[in-house]
Amino acid sequence: MEHFDASLSTYFKAFLGPRDTRVKGWFLLDNYIPTFVCSVIYLLIVWLGPKYMKNRQPFSCRGILQLYNLGLTLLSLYMFYELVTGVWEGKYNFFCQGTRSAGESDMKIIRVLWWYYFSKLIEFMDTFFFILRKNNHQITVLHVYHHATMLNIWWFVMNWVPCGHSYFGATLNSFIHVLMYSYYGLSSIPSMRPYLWWKKYITQGQLVQFVLTIIQTTCGVFWPCSFPLGWLFFQIGYMISLIALFTNFYIQTYNKKGASRRKDHLKGHQNGSVAAVNGHTNSFPSLENSVKPRKQRKD
């Protein structure tokens, strides 16, 4: 295993250059194998988990879900605050920021971004809860792609570009996750569900986040600094892939659902009644079908 790890390190160095020594010895960062193994285990659970649960009753997980979502909401809020203050204190340049130009503020950003990397490992639990609760329809290609790739990408980011221009996408994503995990936490409380009308706006916020990240990353291409250009091009490509997948998800989830509701609404009016609007069917059975003829008494 050590020989394999040494070979990987040699390959990475030849392809990406020397690692950033400021993160040497940090948990999970010296060796890529643990991150890779965690990702493989995640994909195996995604594949085998629904098969295991197929003939079993779903778990509620309500209590632990509330704690989990609260924990990630607070962690995301902490990361957002620390990144914003670190960028402000270091006087980061929006257009392009190198990885060794802000002294102690860079170290603050690095420490927070390590938590951001580690949070991507914690977020594997999103999928595991879907499996345990048998919400398999939520385990989409987008969901698995996003979760499986982010942990691996951020291992490389933390080893080669752990601060500087890397901060922007993580800052926006932390803010979006404050909203998202707050929503998930509240949705696990049945009495709160009727008031949670803003789910689609979280998806819109995610799309805006990706577009803004592309814009800010592109600034580093046109107004370059010491931040490596290769990383900027990679991030632009990755953001484009997420925009494509999230846009498809948004269309499938909201636009088609809205069109289906309008169609059902129109059909209901044509039949003289409104049958299915906003996902709810008419709670009153038709009089024609519900009134049964009385049997004649034999006495």
Curated annotation (Swiss-Prot):
Residues 279-289 have a biased composition (Polar residues). GO terms for cellular component: dendrite; dendritic tree; endoplasmic reticulum membrane; neuronal cell body. Keywords: Acetylation, Cell projection, Endoplasmic reticulum, Fatty acid biosynthesis, Fatty acid metabolism, Lipid biosynthesis, Lipid metabolism, Membrane, Transferase, Transmembrane, Transmembrane helix. It is found in: Endoplasmic reticulum membrane; Cell projection, Dendrite. One of its GO terms (biological process) is positive regulation of fatty acid biosynthetic process. Its EC number is 2.3.1.199. It comes from the Eukaryota. Pathway: Lipid metabolism; polyunsaturated fatty acid biosynthesis. The modification N-acetylmethionine is found at residue 1. InterPro entries: ELO_fam, ELOVL5. GO terms for molecular function: fatty acid elongase activity. It catalyses: a very-long-chain acyl-CoA + malonyl-CoA + H(+) = a very-long-chain 3-oxoacyl-CoA + CO2 + CoA; (6Z,9Z,12Z)-octadecatrienoyl-CoA + malonyl-CoA + H(+) = (8Z,11Z,14Z)-3-oxoeicosatrienoyl-CoA + CO2 + CoA; (9Z,12Z,15Z)-octadecatrienoyl-CoA + malonyl-CoA + H(+) = (11Z,14Z,17Z)-3-oxoeicosatrienoyl-CoA + CO2 + CoA; (9Z)-hexadecenoyl-CoA + malonyl-CoA + H(+) = 3-oxo-(11Z)-octadecenoyl-CoA + CO2 + CoA. Residues 274-299 are annotated as: Disordered. The chain crosses the membrane at residues 26-46, 64-84, 112-132, 139-158, 168-187, 205-225, 227-247. The keyword Transmembrane helix applies. Belongs to the ELO family. ELOVL5 subfamily. Interacts with TECR. Catalyzes the first and rate-limiting reaction of the four reactions that constitute the long-chain fatty acids elongation cycle. This endoplasmic reticulum-bound enzymatic process allows the addition of 2 carbons to the chain of long- and very long-chain fatty acids (VLCFAs) per cycle. Condensing enzyme that acts specifically toward polyunsaturated acyl-CoA with the higher activity toward C18:3(n-6) acyl-CoA. This is Very long chain fatty acid elongase 5.
